[in-house]
């Protein structure tokens, strides 16, 4: 049963003049994937020349390391087209990689030592050197192994027509820009409250190779499989836990989401406050720098969060300055594991679910969220990460115990109402059918991605690494056999040439030293 506020919002939007206000949701995907050799070992080769410059190619770049590819789709209103673009980008890249493969899961394997992970290189320009030094700082702060974890980022923006309708229906006194920013922050707060559901449904990293731990001790109740596989029998997403990407080293950062000014102030404090932990590492002012600077965060991107408010920044503009200039433009969901059951790392049912879930997060009442509630939400996520498929599991629901099943059923009953509204607006039926199908996963944890993964891993009798390697080989063959669907090979080759030309132009146009460049970046006059 939908809550009163959600029902009212859906009823108001369902009248004729607002009926199609939701039409025009835009999305973009960033999918990360490690390049591996044919034996599964992480590649030590440079970024493939055939895909152009990692600095300036807008579709194919690198993340932390030379071997961690990132595929970026343009913004689109068509989920199907976005998936086709991802296929084209990965097919094209595989053609330039020789006998190398794309790792099909989030957690890395077959890495003997973190020094085997080569930090991404972006050329000799000041901006390229800054990107590499930032990554050097990440290595020295958190270790390279954590940075080798891959994920999928789902970017979404709602159409102006929806914001205008909501602004009218709520009789808001705010400017439309401020109203939109407040709306996205309301979405973010609700997303954080029920983030555990994303981990339960789509978490796909319940297993890892023991080499990932690099000798670190852990209290997690791992079961062993084969020579070196560790897995949580009822876990969901190790990537999102304390072993993974949302590193506990940042747990003391108090970034809040109740207003744009509050969010920006929290981040700016972190990038301007000297760190007690990293102060002994030389920064860019030294002859042999190990990090950009000695602050709690080197730059804003270092803040690990499962969701971020975003605005496209102008040249030389920081992310928070862009937000202050013109408000929130879209949100970036960073909580998705690579989907091992999809050759591109995400599939259409996830698009449909996230459309509904994020619309629900936007339309549902979203009270202010204090630090205690943020902490509670993080603890719920940790619980689901480590034992989300445990029968009768209890979560903390406003300081009262509530079973995951009860809470999940309640959420899905509300998602069902949102899905009906969206189906009517779009003239489709897939939103309702997706929600109806996934609702059955709440009481059948074996249907979740992590449940399926553990079952197939156990049935295969293989180590996690060899199981993933077999998937990688299958997906490479599938990409090779496929035709280009949206991007032509010629267009992709043109982007390679343009990116190489653009990198050269940037390098030739630099007129100040690297130190002077960073002085200006960190202390703009």
UniProtKB/Swiss-Prot annotation:
Any Pfam family hit: Glu_cys_ligase
Keyword ATP-binding appears in the UniProt entry: yes
EC number(s) on file: 6.3.2.2
GO MF entries: ATP binding; glutamate-cysteine ligase activity; metal ion binding
Classification via SUPFAM superfamilies: Glutamine synthetase/guanido kinase
Catalytic activity: L-cysteine + L-glutamate + ATP = gamma-L-glutamyl-L-cysteine + ADP + phosphate + H(+)
GO biological process, alphabetically ordered: glutathione biosynthetic process
Domain of life: Bacteria
Keyword Manganese: no
Pathway(s) this gene product operates in, as recorded in its UniProt entry: Sulfur metabolism; glutathione biosynthesis; glutathione from L-cysteine and L-glutamate: step 1/2
UniProt keyword list: ATP-binding, Glutathione biosynthesis, Ligase, Nucleotide-binding
Cited InterPro entries: Gln_synth/guanido_kin_cat_dom, Glu_cys_ligase, Glut_cys_ligase
GO terms under cellular component: cytosol
NCBIfam families hit by this protein: glu_cys_ligase (TIGR01434)
Stated family: Belongs to the glutamate--cysteine ligase type 1 family. Type 1 subfamily.
Name of the featured protein: Glutamate--cysteine ligase
Upper classification of the organism: Bacteria, Pseudomonadati, Pseudomonadota, Gammaproteobacteria, Alteromonadales
């Amino acid at each position: 049963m939908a809550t009163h506020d959600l029902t009212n919002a859906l009823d108001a939007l369902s009248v004729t003049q607002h009926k199609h206000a939701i039409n025009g949701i835009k999305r973009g995907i960033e999918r990360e994937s490690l390049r591996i050799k044919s034996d599964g070992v992480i590649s030590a080769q440079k970024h493939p020349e055939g895909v152009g410059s990692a600095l300036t190619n807008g579709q194919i770049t690198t993340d932390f390391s030379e071997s961690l590819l990132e595929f970026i789709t343009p913004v689109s209103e068509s989920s199907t087209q976005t998936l086709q673009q991802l296929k084209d980008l990965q097919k094209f890249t595989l053609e330039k990689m020789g006998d190398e493969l794309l790792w099909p899961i989030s957690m890395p394997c077959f890495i003997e030592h973190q020094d085997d992970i080569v930090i991404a290189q972006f050329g000799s320009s000041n901006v390229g050197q800054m990107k590499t030094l930032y990554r050097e700082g990440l290595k020295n702060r958190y270790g390279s192994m954590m940075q080798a974890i891959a994920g999928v980022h789902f970017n979404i923006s709602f159409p102006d027509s929806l914001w205008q309708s909501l602004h009218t229906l709520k009789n808001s006194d705010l400017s439309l820009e401020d109203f939109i920013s407040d709306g996205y922050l309301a979405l973010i707060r609700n997303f954080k409250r029920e983030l555990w559901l994303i981990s339960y449904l789509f978490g796909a990293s319940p297993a890892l190779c023991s080499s990932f731990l690099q000798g670190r001790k852990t209290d997690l109740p791992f079961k062993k499989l084969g020579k070196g596989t560790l897995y949580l029998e009822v876990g969901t997403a190790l990537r999102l836990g304390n072993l993974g990407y949302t590193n506990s080293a940042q747990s003391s950062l108090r970034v809040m989401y109740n207003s744009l000014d509050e969010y920006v102030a929290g981040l700016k404090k972190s990038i301007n406050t000297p760190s007690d932990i990293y102060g002994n590492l030389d920064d860019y002012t030294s002859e042999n720098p190990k990090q950009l600077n000695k602050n709690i965060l080197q730059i804003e991107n270092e803040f690990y969060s499962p969701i971020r408010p975003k605005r496209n920044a102008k040249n030389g503009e920081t992310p928070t300055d862009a937000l202050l200039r013109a408000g929130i433009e879209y949100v970036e969901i960073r909580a998705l594991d690579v989907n091992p059951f999809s050759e591109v790392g995400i599939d259409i049912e996830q698009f449909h679910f996230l459309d509904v879930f994020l619309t629900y997060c936007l339309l549902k009442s979203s009270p202010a969220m204090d630090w205690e509630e943020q902490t509670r939400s993080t603890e719920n996520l940790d619980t689901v990460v480590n034992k989300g498929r445990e029968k009768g599991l209890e979560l903390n629901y406003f300081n009262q115990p509530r079973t995951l099943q009860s809470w999940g059923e309640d959420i899905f009953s509300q998602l069902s109402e949102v899905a009906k509204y969206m189906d009517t607006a779009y003239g489709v039926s897939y939103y309702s059918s997706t929600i109806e199908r996934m609702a059955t996963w709440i009481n059948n944890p074996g249907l979740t991605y992590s449940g399926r993964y553990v079952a197939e891993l156990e049935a295969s009798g293989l180590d996690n690494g060899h199981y993933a390697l077999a998937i990688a080989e299958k997906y490479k063959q599938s990409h090779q056999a496929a035709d280009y669907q949206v991007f032509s090979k010629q267009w992709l080759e043109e982007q390679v040439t343009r990116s190489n030309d653009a990198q050269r132009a940037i390098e030739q146009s630099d007129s100040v030293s690297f130190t002077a460049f960073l002085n200006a970046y960190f202390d703009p006059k």
